[in-house]
Amino acid sequence: MSSSSSSSASSAAAAAFRPAVVQREQQVVEEKFPAAAAAMREMVLPPVAAAAADSEQEQLCYVHCHYCDTVLVVSVPSSSLFETVTVRCGHCSSLLTVNMRGLLLPTTAAAAPPPPPPPPPPPPPPAAHFPHSLNLAPANPPHHHSLLDEISTANSPTQLLLEQHGLGGLMASAASCRNNNSPAAAAAPPPPTSQGKAAAKEPSPRTNTAVINRPPEKRQRVPSAYNRFIKDEIQRIKAGNPDISHREAFSAAAKNWAHFPHIHFGLMPDHQGLKKTSLLPQDHQRKDGLLKEGLYAAAAAAAAAANMGVAPY
């Protein structure tokens, strides 16, 4: 019944747009050959059904063009609903890349019913109320004391016995050590005292030890008789001959010390058995005077050294 009504409606709709001659011929064919007319209608219906199926497989989507600020109505095939498609704007001819998955999922999420709210948390169990007679816990519990504190602070017969046997000081020292190791005692700095200031001013024992262990300072040594003789002899030779070099004067002074060993003992020179040697080859005129002056100066230096307590060589 429904198929005949739909076929008649479709034929009537098609006949409204056909010429009058074609409509008449179709009516004659339907009257004479009803079976052939029904077959022809069945052959025409499938394309219409296919078009309806295609229209059902497509979905209308709304795309916003960011170039011209226009909302576009786009028909997207069902095979491309979860892909990225390219849409051309009919207003500004711009190409838009649209992700259909992101475009359709918000509508699906909006259409879905909201999830039920989570159940509220269970209320906490009521606190047990005890009468005051059974409430054994104090409001402010005292700090836990060790056994040493109780023994040291309590005035008990045990404390008296310990003091009698000489162990009271041991317990007191243990209690003081425990108090010093507590966090409060470690955090609080010790109060400054006058004794502490005096101790800070005084040098530490370690510093005193370092001063004691320091090696003794070297005393300035007294120049030897040889050094004094050479120094005086060089000055005497340079005074007599200013043009002489220091090396030549030192060589002459060393020869005087080597050639006259008796002057080392502070003795006066003996001119009887002494061989005269020329000290300065370039000065032949004053060699006797230089020799005598050198001998007497060396003897005087040796005598002075002997008087000062210098041991002879």
From Swiss-Prot:
Cellular compartments per GO CC: nucleus
Start and end residues, zinc fingers (C4-type): 65-92
Subcellular compartments: Nucleus
Gene Ontology molecular functions: zinc ion binding
Record bears the keyword DNA repair: no
Tissues with expression: Expressed in shoot apex and young inflorescences.
Keywords of the record: Metal-binding, Nucleus, Zinc, Zinc-finger
Predominant subcellular localization, coarse grouping: nucleus
Compositionally biased region (Pro residues): 112-128
Keyword Cytoplasm set for record: no
GO BP term, pick one: fruit development
Cited PANTHER family: AXIAL REGULATOR YABBY 1, PROTEIN YABBY 6-RELATED
Name used for this protein in its record: Protein YABBY 3
Gene name for this UniProt entry: YAB3
